[in-house]
C-alpha cells in the first residue's frame, strides 16, 4: 500500500475533509476548493504532528526505546514542523520552549502508561477504500493497529487541553470513518481506542474505547454521500458559532465573505 502522502496526490476524500465541511462549509471551500493561502498556523498543528511522530517511533521500536529517545524524536520533528509552518502563532503565555517542555511531560506520561508493547501489529498503516456513491476513494492512516485481547483494535493518539467527556468517542466521526475503512480493507470490524494525553503540568492519559455497529457504518455511507452532494451543489456558508473560529487559518478571508 502506498503511503498516505502518496495517496493525497490524487483526488480523494478524507475524514478531515468531511469533518471540516460539517464544522464549517466555508472553511472547507477556502481549504479544499480555493486552496487559499493560510493566514496563520496555530501551534497545535506542528505540536500534534511532532507528538504523533514520536509515538509512532515508540510503537515501531518497542520497549527498547527509552523515554529520552522518544523526547528527542519529538524535539527534532517539532523544530522542523515549526520552521515549515506558515505564520506560526502561539497562544497567550505559550512559546516554542514552553511547548517543548509540555511535549516532554506528555510523552513521559504516555510512555509510563504504554500498554501495547507486545500487541502492535502495524504502525502508520495507510488505507484507500471505496465508499458506495462517492466519486473519490476515502483515504487515511491508522496511527497504530494492535491486538487487544481477542480483538483487533485501531489506536489513535490525541493531544487535548482537557480530559474527554464520557461518551465523546462513541459519537466521533473519525472512529466511524476509520472503522468503515478497516472493515472494507480487512473484512473485519475492529475496536477503536483513543489514547488522549492532556496538555497540562501533570498530564493524564486516558483510554477511550468505542466500536461501530453495521447500522452505524451504513449511516456513515449515507452521511458521506450527503456531504458530497452538498459540496457539489455549492452550499458553502460560515459557521461562526464553531469552537475552532479562534484558530481558523482563514479568519480574515471569512470576515470579507458575502
Regions found by a protein language model. Give the residues of each.
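RecB-family 4Fe-4S metal-dependent nuclease core
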Residues: 1-258
